[in-house]
Amino acid sequence: FGLGCAAKWTGIYAGAGLAVLYLGVLWARRQQGRPGFWAEFRLAALGGVLFYVVLPLCIYVASYLPYWWRQPDFSLGDWWRCQLSMYSYHATLKATHPFESRWYTWLLGLRPVWYYRNGSLPYGMKASIAGMAGPVIWVVGLAALMGLFWHQVSGRGSRQGAAVLILYGTQLIPWMLVTRCTFLYHYFPSSMFCLAALALMLARMRHRDWARRLCAGLCAAAAVLFAVYYPALSGLPIPAWWADALEVLPSFGFY
């Protein structure tokens, strides 16, 4: 958690999901009515503060050690002003970008982020780099998430399914409230739970022949699509006809 926040503040969203799971486990134990719960709760609360607040904060502050090494007079006040400056930048950002996208387009990966184009290639060749969705994992995973949600609300859910939904939601829901310029890559942390949801749903059906065939088919489709789109992920030069064929939606536009 501390390392995640040190890399990017959106790691706080993951911390919120962990906190919900932590409190949920404590609540479940309280509902069991076992003796000695409050002693266990006090120990768990102390551990939660220590390992979810104090230790991550220390790790976050320690990530600024290069500042102190380079500039010995760098103070905690300077550190705090860095935090205020970063917050102010993101809170007041008014810039726009041709490849920005809203959160609801991320669910199906409708608007990739274009990073690079090589304009010095021979005629008939193209090279580009874009950040985009893995269509099998994202699209089928979204369906699996909806299936998990239905199982939970219909009383047939599991703790694993609830955990996946909570962690997915705490990564995505905050972005629904953001009005500034956002991009597809903000959904990447949430997309990991699409894969987890897909794994859970397939595990439920593992004893059915058609489910095993479906699993094999999805793996094969994901591998084929990765190979087909690898040039757009890596900048590998390819013939123009191949590049043009990769832009299956008007919103892609990365060649």
Model-derived features with residue positions:
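Membrane-interface alpha helices of multi-pass inner-membrane proteins
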Residues: 1-9, 19, 172
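Hydrophobic/aromatic-rich transmembrane helices and adjacent perimembrane loops
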Residues: 13, 182-203
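Hydrophobic transmembrane alpha-helices of multi-pass, membrane-embedded glycosylation machinery
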Residues: 15-26, 189-192
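Transmembrane helical bundles and short interhelical boundary loops of multi-pass, membrane-embedded
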Residues: 20-21, 26-27, 34-52, 56, ...
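Membrane-lumen/periplasm interface segments of specific transmembrane helices
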Residues: 28, 45-110, 114-116, 228, ...
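Membrane-interface helix-loop-helix junctions at transmembrane boundaries of multi-pass membrane enzymes
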Residues: 29-47, 144-165
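Membrane-interface anchor segments at the N-terminal boundary of transmembrane helices
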Residues: 113-161
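Membrane-interface catalytic loops of GT-C/OST-like multi-pass glycosylation enzymes that act
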Residues: 176-188, 232-237
